[in-house]
């Protein structure tokens, strides 16, 4: 089992090495060339637990023993999620919602970032690397807190998270600023998420920077979904949700299903593509964007163009113009053509755009449907679904639900991925339903609970009473300097 870079066929690593390195030296992402060679035995997984399905999926992607995989899964999830099924499926009048927000930080990122630290620890022992790992992560709000919580006080790891100072919700910012852990550091930047993500990607290909870290016995890795170890765990809940429909007789085994995914960096929806490649019967993957609809334009025209205004929306975790994981999809639909991918990514870096045509675009359009919702439509959807189903959506899930309603399919069951608790975006959710008088987000959190009786996740209760530990704000150009200065604190 060998991973290679999307941009260079000669850069190859085993799974443990790929998880630890995160990003290839020239900027490519690690992929399995023969993805789909081995398939899941879905029939054998009917009635199995989340843990057992996760183990079956991981066996297709990592070079760990069965015992090591089982230990990773147990350590990641047992007792850490508020629902015994980890990612429960809820039936509404029009379709199903897959709740991915029952983890330690109330966002779907918990699924991947609870398992990644366990994969990292195991990989370190397998490659016998004596260096510590520095996890560098850019966040549009949810990844940061989930990564911090996942790697908090994990031996031989240090983690630094960078977020856009004015580009996350009050709750998301407070979650990160109050983070505990002797190996954690959080810093805001003046800029947007793309600035933070680009800054980190540049450090991964900065040989001088990596040499300086190595002199301190430290190697770089990432907790973003550019790391294959973050992406693989997300494949699991696609399989689990499908099997839930089979187990409850909503579909028969081998019936195809649609998945509707609120999408920013393209990692979550790519996990659905991976699930199909290993045998899951997927009809369409429906990509839902907010007003930063660069992916909608690409999936409908083949032109990817980030040369546009960056818009702040009520769904800030999707406020992204550079969708990193799209590179992995392009690799597969181009027939694993590394040189072609290298050229596309060079065009994107130099001109801010690239275009795909012909067979590549046809393959994408065959599997993907795209739609988007603006802020007004998002808030209208929150209100409509609450009134119709007595169910509370967060802003990102509302974007997906609006796109789902535009693409109703009577021939296939559909699952909408719900990526965050509504309490992470309280002001936007509350004001979709009720009048506000300028209250702060934490006051509105309690009022939303009083009005709807939806339980506030334990990790968000009394969040505003916790000590602020991380107050640093820097210019985006100063990330390298900041990291080297602060390493000694970890």
Question: What name fits each language-model region?
Answer:
Residues 1-490:
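PLP-dependent amino-acid enzyme catalytic core
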């Amino acid at each position: 089992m060998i991973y290679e870079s999307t941009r260079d066929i000669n850069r190859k690593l085993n799974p443990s090495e790929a998880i630890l390195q995160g990003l290839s030296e020239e900027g490519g992402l690690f992929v399995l060339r023969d993805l789909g060679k081995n398939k899941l035995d879905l029939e054998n997984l009917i009635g199995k637990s989340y843990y057992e399905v996760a183990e079956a999926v991981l066996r297709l992607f990592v070079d760990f023993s069965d015992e090591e995989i089982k230990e990773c899964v147990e350590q990641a999830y047992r007792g850490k999620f508020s629902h015994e099924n980890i990612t429960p499926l809820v039936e509404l009048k029009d379709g199903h919602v897959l709740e991915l927000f029952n983890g330690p930080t109330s966002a779907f990122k918990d699924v991947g970032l609870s398992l990644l630290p366990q994969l990292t620890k195991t990989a370190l022992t397998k490659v016998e690397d004596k260096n510590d790992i520095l996890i560098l992560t850019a966040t549009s709000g949810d990844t940061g807190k989930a990564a911090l919580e996942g790697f908090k006080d994990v031996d031989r790891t240090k983690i630094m998270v960078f977020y856009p100072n004015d580009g996350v919700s009050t709750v998301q910012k407070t979650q990160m600023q109050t983070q505990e852990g002797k190996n954690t550091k959080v810093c805001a930047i003046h800029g947007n998420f793309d600035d933070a993500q680009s800054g980190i990607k540049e450090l991964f290909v900065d040989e001088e920077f990596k040499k300086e870290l190595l002199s301190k016995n430290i190697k770089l890795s990432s907790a973003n979904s550019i790391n294959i170890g973050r992406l693989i765990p997300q494949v699991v809940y696609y399989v689990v949700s499908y099997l839930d429909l089979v187990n409850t007789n909503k579909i028969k085994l081998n019936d195809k299903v649609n998945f509707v995914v609120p999408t920013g960096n393209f990692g979550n929806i790519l996990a659905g593509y991976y699930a199909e490649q290993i045998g899951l019967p997927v009809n369409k993957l429906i990509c839902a964007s907010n007003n930063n609809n660069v992916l909608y334009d690409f999936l409908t025209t083949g032109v990817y163009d980030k040369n546009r205004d960056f818009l702040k929306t009520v769904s800030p975790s999707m406020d992204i113009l550079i969708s990193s994981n799209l590179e992995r999809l392009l690799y597969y639909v181009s027939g694993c053509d590394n040189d072609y991918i290298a050229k596309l990514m060079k065009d994107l870096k130099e001109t801010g755009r690239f275009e795909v045509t012909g067979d590549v675009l046809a393959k994408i359009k065959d599997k993907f449907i795209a739609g988007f919702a603006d802020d007004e439509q998002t808030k209208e959807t929150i209100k409509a679904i609450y009134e119709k189903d007595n169910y509370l959506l967060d802003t990102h899930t509302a974007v997906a639900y609006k796109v789902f309603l535009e693409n109703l399919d009577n021939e296939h069951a559909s699952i909408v991925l719900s990526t965050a608790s509504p309490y992470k975006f309280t002001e936007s959710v509350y004001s979709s339903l009720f009048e506000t008088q300028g209250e702060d987000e934490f006051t509105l959190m309690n009022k939303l609970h009083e009005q709807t009786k939806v339980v506030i996740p334990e990790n968000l209760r009394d969040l505003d009473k916790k000590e602020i530990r991380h107050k640093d704000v820097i210019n985006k150009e100063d990330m390298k300097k900041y990291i080297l200065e602060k390493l000694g604190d970890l």
